[in-house]
Amino acid sequence: MTPTLETKYVFTITARIGDVTSAGEIGTGVRRIIPILGGEVKGEGISGKVLPFGADFQIIRPNELIELEAKYAFETDDGAVVYVENAGIRFGPVELLQKLKCGEPVDPKLIYFRTRPRFETGHPNYQWLMQHLFIGSAARHADRVVIDVHQVL
């Protein structure tokens, strides 16, 4: 019997983002830094706000594959602060990736954008975030990134 992998949707992170800062070509690609300005977290049993600090650190490889590593935090409505490290990749047809870079709309279904969020918190209500693996299915918009977070069962 082939093993299966099941997931369940748990919440959505909508992170508002600022203007891109480029550190230029670093030998392995172009380094970009995108500030996280705030946002919201919404799901069953968890809701709150993305705190206005942190950033998404990216390298755009020569083949246009984008490697991402975002570090930020959110605060739940009941006062828990949750630190987030979210690594992932974004890839698709070059012409669509170029549109995204220019802030133009692109159908998210046409871009492969997946992440592996990790969470840390000392709040007892949210220890489960540190006791499971999660996968994010994400979409990039001109002013925000939307990540649907799924728990691996």
UniProtKB/Swiss-Prot annotation:
Residue stretches in coiled coil: none
Superkingdom assignment: Bacteria
S-S bonds: none
Similarity-based family: Belongs to the UPF0311 family.
PANTHER family, sorted: UPF0311 PROTEIN BLR7842
Protein name listed in UniProt: UPF0311 protein Rpal_1987
